[in-house]
């Protein structure tokens, strides 16, 4: 397994004075104090012990409220699993769904972890090159051409890292139409849902 090229650039940039690193996807501002204060309060209250495997129930309930408010999606806390980060969630999802020989469709450019995790499960990464003239959106005809009888999973990484591309409602409906009647699962990586620019707005 090759080391991450992005992490290599991150390490190099850290050693160069006055270098602005674009190597990892994180904001250029510090964590807001409302979040820091909540973390400090949690530590002061001794909330440092093991939780339920799925995560703290109150947190899962709050995630459900966020999804309803922001994405108009309705879930119950029993349907939510809290992980230590986005990469772990991606890893667990791919490991749960993909068996040796299964194909995983990955639009590119993309986050670096999709391919190695797929390979570790014995799955086969199938790359689709999105184009600048399409604003790096996955087109339905590209997806249709990539599907085979071995296709198990489509990764939808939008808003996209690193391009910032966003799929609109018509794009998503066209993708859904291609997948209707199949057993293909979708991993929707929406970690950058709140980081869109201009008039673009993320639709889950």
Predicted segments, located by residue:
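Helix C-cap/helix->beta junction micro-motif
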Residues: 16, 121, 181-182
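A short helix-loop-beta submotif of the ANL/AMP-binding
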Residues: 120-126
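N-terminal small-domain helix-loop-helix segment of the aminotransferase-like
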Residues: 1-85, 92
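Conserved PLP-anchoring active-site segment centered on the Schiff-base-forming lysine
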Residues: 96-118
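Short acidic capping loops at alpha-helix termini that bridge into adjacent secondary structure
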Residues: 74-80, 100-103, 150
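Active-site phosphate-binding strand-loop segment of PLP-dependent enzymes
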Residues: 126, 130-201
């Amino acid at each position: 397994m090759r080391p991450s090229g992005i992490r290599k650039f991150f390490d190099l940039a850290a050693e160069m004075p006055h270098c602005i690193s674009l190597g990892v996807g994180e904001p250029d501002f510090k964590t807001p104090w409302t979040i820091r204060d909540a973390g400090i309060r949690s530590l002061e209250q001794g909330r440092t012990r093991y939780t339920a495997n799925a995560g703290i129930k109150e947190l899962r309930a709050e995630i459900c409220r966020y999804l309803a408010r922001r994405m108009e999606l309705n879930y119950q806390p029993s349907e939510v699993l809290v992980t230590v980060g986005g990469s772990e969630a991606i890893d667990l999802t791919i490991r749960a769904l993909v068996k040796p020989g299964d194909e995983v469709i990955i639009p590119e450019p993309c986050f670096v972890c999709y391919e190695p995790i797929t390979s570790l499960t014995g799955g086969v990464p199938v790359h689709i090159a999105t184009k600048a003239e399409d604003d790096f959106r996955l087109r339905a005809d590209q997806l249709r051409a990539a599907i085979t009888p071995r296709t198990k999973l489509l990764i939808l990484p939008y808003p996209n890292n690193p391009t910032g591309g966003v799929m609109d409602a018509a794009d998503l409906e066209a993708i859904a139409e291609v997948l209707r009647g199949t057993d293909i699962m979708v991993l929707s990586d929406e970690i950058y849902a709140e980081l869109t620019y201009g008039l673009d707005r993320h639709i889950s």
